[in-house]
C-alpha cells in the first residue's frame, strides 16, 4: 500500500510555479520591458529555461545599479557537443558573453555575461545549432550524465550513452513555453525521441491525466533532480551523488539485461542547519531494460507527490528517503510502477576515471582527453586553449564530449591526425595531462565570485594558488608526487561535489572555509567536516601537521582520504594539537673553484662520505 501525501503549507515558489502558466509567465511579460533584469518571480521561473540572473560583484559601485548579467546553461546528455554547436557557442561567447566558455561538473557548457536584451537571440542561436537550454536548471530533471569515454567496442558504454539521452528526452518538460518565449512558437527539434520514449510517455502510471505536464504537473518537482547512467566499475560521473543512479548490466552474450538502480544521493546543505546534509544514494534494486523508463517515471512521480513542498531546504528526494527509509520509499515506487523491484545485482568496485590523454576508441579512431582547470575555456596570454579548441573542431570537424570533472574529450580522431593535433596544442601553449600537476588533475572548483549570487567567498579564482600551496607543503614532507582529490566551493551548496573529496574547502565566510576530510579517491565515501572555520591565511598551519602525520603513519599505497578515514578524526586532531613545527634550518651556499671541487669530490668518494660533510670538516679544521 502506498503512503498518503500529507497536506502541506506550500512555499512561495510552489505557488509561483502553479501561477506561471506552465513556465510562461512572468518571463513573457518581463521580456517586453526595457529593464536590465527580471524581478524575483521572473528569476525563479527563468531557471527552468536554463538561465540564472547574476550580477558581477567586481563591478558594483555604491549608488549605481548592479551589473546585471545572465548565465546560460546547456542541456547536453552524456556531455555530447557536436562541432556545429561548439563553434556556435565559441562565437556567442565573443558576440554576447564574457569571452569564455565553462564546462560544468554535469557535462554541460555554460555561457556567462549575457545581457537580458540578448537572451532571446542567444538561446535561439543555440537551439538552431543543435543545442538547448531547456530544463538545464529549475525544479525538474537536470542534465543526465554518462561516462564520456566514446568506446565503440564496449557495448555497455553505448548503452549508457543511449539511455542517458533517452531519459533526458523522457523527462523534458512538455509545455510549449520554452519555444513560445525564445523561438516565437517555432518548435525546432534536432530529432524525434526514441520510439520507446514516446511509448513510455503514453504509460498512464504516475502521470497526471489531462495536464499540460502529465509527469511534472503544474508545480513541477519540489526541487532539482539529477540522474546519471554508468557502467559497472566506472565512477566518472559520481554515481552516489545522484537522485537516481543507473548502472547498465549485460550478459555473456553481449545483451543488455537491465539496470541496478540507486536513489537518494545529493550534495547540497546549509551551514549551521543540521537538518540539511550531503547523502549517498541507496540501492533500490534491479530493473529489466524493458521496464526502466517506467521505473524512472515511478521514482520521479513518488518524489513529485511526497517530496517536501513547504521547505525548499528539505525538498530534495534524499530527505524523503532519509525520513521514510529505503523500504518505505521502495514500496511507494512499486505501487506506481506496478511491479516488485528485484534486489540489485552484484557489481565490481567503482573506480574514478577521467579519460585524460590519448585512448583508442575501438573502431580504429582515437580520442584525446584534455585537462581544463575548473572547466574554464579561455585564451590567457600564451595559454591559448580556446583558440586551440576552435581550430581543432573547425579544421577536423570533430565532436566533443564533456566529462563530469570539467574536462573535454576530442573524439573520432583519425590516427594520422594525432601528430598534427599534438603540435597545434603545443603551439598554442595548451598542456596535456602529462604536463600538469597531478593535484590539478584531480581538483574541481565552482565559479563562485564574482558572478554567483550564492557565493560567500572565492573558489575558481582561488583554486590554482591553493593547489600551489598544497604542493609546497607536500614537497616539504618529501611527498613531491603525492596527489588526491581536492575540491573547492564558494558556498555549502555543493556544486563541485566537495563532500566526496579527500580534501575539500567549503566557503563559510569571506576568505574562510570549512575543511572537509576523508572522502575516497574513487568518490564512494562521504567526507566529514574537520575544521569549521579555516581562514585562508591559516591553510599551511592547519594542513602541515596532517601531511606530517600522513607521511609518518600511512599504510603502503594508502591515499590521503583513506588515511584520514582509517585513523579517525580524534587521532588527526590529537596529532595536530601536539605537533610542533620546526622552521627549516638555513642553508648557506659557498662557491668553490673547479680544481678544488674536483679534489674534494675525489677525496669524498675515497672516504665514502658526502661532499658536504667533507667540505665542512676541512673548513672547520682550517678555522681551528
Swiss-Prot record:
Binding of [4Fe-4S] cluster, residues: 446, 452, 491, 495
Q: What EC number(s) does the entry state?
A: 1.8.7.1
Q: Which residues cross the membrane?
A: none
Cofactor, how bound (note) = Binds 1 siroheme per subunit.
User: Which keywords are on file for this protein?
Assistant: 4Fe-4S, Heme, Iron, Iron-sulfur, Metal-binding, Oxidoreductase, Thioether bond
Record: residues binding siroheme: 495
Keyword match Heme: yes
- Residues of the signal sequence? none
- State its cofactor: siroheme; [4Fe-4S] cluster
The UniProt function text for this chain reads: Catalyzes the reduction of sulfite to sulfide, a step in the biosynthesis of sulfur-containing amino acids and cofactors.
Entry similarity comment: Belongs to the nitrite and sulfite reductase 4Fe-4S domain family.
Protein name per the record: Sulfite reductase [ferredoxin]
Gene responsible for this protein: sir
Amino acid at each position: 500500500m502506498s503512503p498518503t501525501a500529507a497536506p502541506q503549507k506550500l512555499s512561495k515558489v510552489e505557488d509561483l510555479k502553479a501561477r506561471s502558466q506552465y513556465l510562461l509567465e512572468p518571463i513573457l511579460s518581463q521580456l517586453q520591458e526595457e529593464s536590465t533584469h527580471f524581478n524575483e518571480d521572473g528569476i525563479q521561473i527563468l531557471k527552468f529555461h536554463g538561465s540564472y540572473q547574476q550580477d558581477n560583484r567586481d563591478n558594483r559601485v555604491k549608488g549605481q545599479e548592479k551589473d546585471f548579467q545572465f548565465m546560460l546553461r546547456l542541456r547536453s546528455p552524456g556531455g555530447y557537443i557536436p562541432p556545429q554547436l561548439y563553434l556556435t557557442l565559441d562565437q556567442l561567447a565573443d558576440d554576447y558573453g564574457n569571452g569564455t566558455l565553462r564546462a560544468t561538473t554535469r557535462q554541460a557548457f555554460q555561457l556567462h555575461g549575457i545581457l537580458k536584451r540578448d537572451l532571446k537571440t542567444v538561446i535561439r542561436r543555440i537551439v538552431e545549432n543543435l543545442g538547448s537550454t531547456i530544463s538545464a536548471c529549475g525544479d525538474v530533471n537536470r542534465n543526465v550524465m554518462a561516462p564520456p569515454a566514446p568506446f565503440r567496442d564496449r557495448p555497455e558504454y553505448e548503452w549508457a550513452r543511449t539511455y542517458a539521452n533517452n531519459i533526458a528526452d523522457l523527462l523534458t518538460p512538455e509545455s510549449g513555453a520554452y519555444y513560445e518565449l525564445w523561438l516565437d512558437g517555432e518548435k525546432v527539434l534536432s530529432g524525434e525521441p526514441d520510439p520507446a520514449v514516446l511509448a513510455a510517455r503514453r504509460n498512464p502510471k504516475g502521470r497526471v491525466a489531462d495536464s499540460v505536464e502529465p509527469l511534472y504537473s503544474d508545480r513541477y518537482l519540489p526541487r532539482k533532480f539529477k540522474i546519471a547512467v554508468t557502467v559497472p566499475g566506472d565512477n566518472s560521473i559520481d554515481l552516489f551523488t545522484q537522485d537516481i543512479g543507473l548502472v547498465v548490466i549485460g550478459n555473456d552474450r553481449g545483451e543488455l539485461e537491465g539496470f541496478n538502480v540507486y536513489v537518494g544521493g545529493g550534495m547540497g546543505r546549509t551551514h549551521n542547519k543540521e537538518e540539511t546534509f550531503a547523502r549517498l544514494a541507496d540501492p533500490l534494486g534491479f530493473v529489466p531494460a524493458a521496464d526502466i523508463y517506467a521505473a524512472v517515471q515511478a521514482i520521479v512521480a513518488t518524489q513529485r507527490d511526497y517530496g517536501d513542498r513547504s521547505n525548499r531546504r528539505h525538498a530534495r528526494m534524499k530527505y524523503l528517503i532519509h525520513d521514510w527509509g529505503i523500504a518505505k520509499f521502495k514500496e511507494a515506487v512499486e505501487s506506481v510502477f506496478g511491479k516488485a523491484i528485484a534486489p540489485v545485482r552484484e557489481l565490481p568496485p567503482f573506480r574514478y576515471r577521467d579519460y585524460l590523454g590519448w585512448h583508442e576508441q575501438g573502431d580504429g579512431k582515437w580520442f584525446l582527453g584534455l585537462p581544463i582547470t575548473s572547466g574554464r575555456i579561455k585564451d590567457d596570454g600564451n595559454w591559448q586553449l580556446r583558440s586551440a579548441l576552435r581550430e581543432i573542431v573547425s579544421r577536423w570537424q570533430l565532436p566533443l564530449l564533456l566529462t563530469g570533472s570539467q574536462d573535454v574529450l576530442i573524439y573520432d580522431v583519425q590516427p594520422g591526425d594525432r601528430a598534427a593535433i599534438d603540435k597545434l596544442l603545443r603551439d598554442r601553449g595548451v598542456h596535456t595531462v602529462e604536463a600538469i600537476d597531478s593535484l590539478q588533475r584531480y581538483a574541481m572548483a565552482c565559479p563562485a565570485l564574482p558572478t554567483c549570487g550564492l557565493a560567500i567567498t572565492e573558489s575558481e579564482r582561488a583554486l590554482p594558488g591553493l593547489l600551489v600551496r598544497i604542493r609546497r607543503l607536500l614537497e616539504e614532507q618529501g611527498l613531491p608526487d603525492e596527489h588526491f582529490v581536492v575540491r573547492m566551493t564558494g558556498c555549502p551548496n555543493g556544486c563541485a561535489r566537495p563532500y566526496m573529496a579527500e580534501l575539500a574547502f567549503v566557503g563559510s565566510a569571506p576568505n574562510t572555509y570549512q575543511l572537509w576530510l576523508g572522502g575516497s579517491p574513487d568518490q564512494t565515501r562521504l567526507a566529514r567536516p574537520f575544521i569549521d572555520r579555516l581562514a585562508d591565511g591559516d591553510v599551511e598551519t592547519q594542513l602541515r601537521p596532517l601531511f606530517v602525520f600522513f607521511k609518518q603513519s600511512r599504510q603502503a599505497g594508502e591515499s590521503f582520504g583513506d588515511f584520514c578515514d582509517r585513523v579517525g578524526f580524534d587521532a588527526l586532531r590529537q596529532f595536530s594539537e601536539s605537533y610542533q613545527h620546526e622552521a627549516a634550518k638555513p642553508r648557506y651556499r659557498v662557491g668553490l673553484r673547479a680544481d678544488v671541487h674536483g679534489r674534494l669530490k675525489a677525496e669524498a668518494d675515497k672516504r665514502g662520505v658526502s661532499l658536504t660533510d667533507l667540505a665542512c670538516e676541512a673548513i672547520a679544521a682550517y678555522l681551528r
